[in-house]
A protein has these predicted regions:
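Catalytic core of pol beta-like nucleotidyltransferases
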Residues: 1-17, 25-32, 41-109
Length: 109
């Protein structure tokens, strides 16, 4: 997680919240597992995020699979009970920036 925090640090002011989810956060990953990262930002292009994470991919020797949402889009997906977002929110997370309390719209009830 520290490698990812370091590569995202220059973008931190533009990130509302960022976390690792999936097998890495669950502790069930293998050397071949990718690292799933979800970022909520209102003014970051996917290319900026991808470029930052590519450095971490080289360092870690693992593929990083980023998902990027704007705050309003993330809130709408929570409100609409979007399957992917609901599943991710229910799973363990390793926060790279922010905490559970910083998630837009909070946790679904």
């Amino acid at each position: 997680a520290d490698v990812l925090r370091d590569v995202l640090a220059p973008l931190a002011a533009r990130i509302h919240v960022a976390f690792i989810f999936g097998s890495v956060a669950k502790g069930s990953d293998t050397a071949a597992s990718d690292i799933d990262v979800l970022v909520v930002s209102d003014d970051m292009a996917y290319a900026d995020l991808f470029n930052a994470l590519s450095t971490a991919e080289e360092t870690l020797g693992r593929k990083i699979s980023p998902t990027l949402y704007g705050t309003a889009e993330f809130e709408r997906k929570v409100r609409d009970d979007n399957h992917f977002v609901t599943r991710v929110l229910a799973q363990p997370k390793i926060f790279l920036k922010g905490t559970e309390d910083d998630l837009p719209a909070g946790q679904p009830a």
